[in-house]
Amino acid sequence: MKALLLMSGGLDSSSAAYYYTRRGLDFDCLFINYGQRSARMQLRSSKIICEKLNKKLLVADIRKIRELFISDIWLKPHEPITHRNLVIIPIAIAFAKEKGYEEIIIASVKEDCEYEQNRIEIIKELKNLGEILKVKVSTPFAGMPKSFLLKLGVSAGLDPSLTYSCLLGHKYHCGQCSQCLKRKEAFKSANIQDPTKYLNLS
């Protein structure tokens, strides 16, 4: 059964990619450009990670859809796009079904559940959608802290300096958005040196 790992180039999905490669899982990766500001840098990191792991990276470019569900995101650059998973996960499920994948893996961690689109009830309904289309939707790390998944990735060979987390999409991480703050905390909690270059925006 071949799986499809949703890839963003961040700590979580990159750690998952290394973890599953080490375990010998047969999987490809899917990057979805849904109009996020950081798409270019995310895709860059995703390509690097997949090249190092010799994994196929599929890219779905649906950036035009952002106009349908994003209103003032450009006025709130430090905030993640609300409800994005309600859009991209069903697309990933349909994509997997069409391409013959029987499972999609989402590397969401415990901290992600504070966002509305990652609430347990919503994820459960998305899994039900997958069942209808006979595509298993797996969230194996949902109960784990980000720092634990980072440890798994690094122990499997991940160089975290190759990953990208910032919401702004600059060459260097801003260090202030919610994703940068969670990135910093993950390294601190995991007792792993943070190799990230952060901008000084103060």
UniProtKB/Swiss-Prot annotation:
Its cofactor is Zn(2+). The keyword Nucleotide-binding applies. Its EC number is 6.3.4.20. Disulfide bonds: none annotated. Pathway: Purine metabolism; 7-cyano-7-deazaguanine biosynthesis. It catalyses: 7-carboxy-7-deazaguanine + NH4(+) + ATP = 7-cyano-7-deazaguanine + ADP + phosphate + H2O + H(+). CDD domains: QueC-like (cd01995). It comes from the Archaea. Binds 1 zinc ion per subunit. Zn(2+) binds at residues 166, 174, 177, 180. One of its GO terms (molecular function) is ATP binding. Transmembrane segments: none annotated. ATP binds at residues 7-17. Keywords: ATP-binding, Ligase, Metal-binding, Nucleotide-binding, Zinc. InterPro entries: QueC, Rossmann-like_a/b/a_fold. Catalyzes the ATP-dependent conversion of 7-carboxy-7-deazaguanine (CDG) to 7-cyano-7-deazaguanine (preQ(0)). Belongs to the QueC family. This is 7-cyano-7-deazaguanine synthase 1. It comes from Sulfurisphaera tokodaii (strain DSM 16993 / JCM 10545 / NBRC 100140 / 7) (Sulfolobus tokodaii). The lineage of its organism: Archaea, Thermoproteota, Thermoprotei, Sulfolobales, Sulfolobaceae.
